[in-house]
Amino acid sequence: MNSMLNPNAVPFQPSPQVVALPMQYPSGFSSGYRRQRDPAFRPMFRRQNNGNQNRSRQNRQRLQNNNRGNNRNRNQFNRRQNQPSQSMSFEQQLLLMANETAYAATYPSDMQNIAPTKLVKIAKRAAMQIVSGHATVEISNGTEDSNQRVATFTIKVVMN
């Protein structure tokens, strides 16, 4: 009947079913953020009920200072626990790590003909340059013009 009155009318089509999707926040935006605000939060009337703003600012500062102190103590405690055993000197530990890195290194196929002990020495020298941080030592052949150089090191330091 509608179509008779209105020649341009489209025959009745049900609206597509809308399935409720969970809200997707942009990355780094926590969903808990919305819950912290009181439901009557209205940005236009924000300054309605905060009394003396200066006093509240001082209180906030005091709270921050308390937290800071607590964190400092906790960090010192952790540092004391995490200290490496003093039985082995730092250089020895570094040498050990260098050995492990050297043996774990993978060498390109064109370097397989070099004596493995020499390769390990090269890798160890490279690993000794890494004092902190996890690193992968890639060993590649020297450039064509410098044949006397056995290998060049590219040391990637990966932050943990």
Curated annotation (Swiss-Prot):
GO cellular component: host cell nucleolus; host cell nucleoplasm; ribonucleoprotein complex; viral nucleocapsid
Upper lineage: Viruses, Riboviria, Orthornavirae, Pisuviricota, Pisoniviricetes
Signal peptide interval: none
Keywords: Host nucleus, Ribonucleoprotein, RNA-binding, Viral nucleoprotein, Virion
Sequence segments annotated as region (involved in nuclear and nucleolar localization): 31-60
GTP-binding is among the record's keywords: no
Region described as Disordered: spans on this chain: 44-88
Motif (Nuclear export signal): 146-155
GO molecular function, one term: RNA binding
Protein name listed in UniProt: Nucleoprotein
One Pfam family, short name: Nucleocapsid-N
Chain's role: Major structural component of virions that associates with genomic RNA.
InterPro entries: Torovirus_nucleocapsid (IPR020253)
Subcellular location: Virion; Host nucleus, Host nucleoplasm; Host nucleus, Host nucleolus
Start-end of Low complexity biased regions: 46-83
Primary residence: virion
Organism: Berne virus
UniProt superkingdom: Viruses
Similarity comment text for this entry: Belongs to the toroviruses nucleocapsid protein family.
